[in-house]
């Protein structure tokens, strides 16, 4: 039965980590190297993440500076950033690429908050589905005689505790991201 509880916690933690990655990709109007996480460049025929082709610095709150290790890849990186449709406009001087991150309007901030809430709700649904799967597994084990009725009750309570903790953590992550987005 402890295997089921451990699997529950592990799967719920993966959902939380996935949420964390998704939230990192939502810009709060400040320059952040995570903005380029999903951008891949066709580098000598292989799709390669920008982070592997260049160093990314944030010298100012609203400026990203990308310094490619291979200066011949500047144009390719610039095209990939434009193609990624991130809502930013890269400029290049042939050696480095600069991205000025525009300040978010109140309307855009509210849209981003809606997106954050939607992503958070999807994570909660994922956690609840894991809870249902694990409870079903416990009931099946009890029906097969692998565990007793008391162990079923105890296991169900442990799964519920793990669910409650995960939901609380998700709510906190969402609240923090909302605060980050809405702060000017």
UniProtKB/Swiss-Prot annotation:
Record's subcellular location: Cytoplasm
Transmembrane annotation, as ranges: none
SUPFAM superfamilies associated with the record: Ribosome recycling factor, RRF
GO MF entries: ribosomal large subunit binding
UniProt record, GO biological process: translation; translational termination
Superkingdom as given in the UniProt entry: Bacteria
GO cellular component terms given for this protein: cytoplasm
Similarity section: Belongs to the RRF family.
Function: Responsible for the release of ribosomes from messenger RNA at the termination of protein biosynthesis. May increase the efficiency of translation by recycling ribosomes from one round of translation to another.
Record's protein name: Ribosome-recycling factor
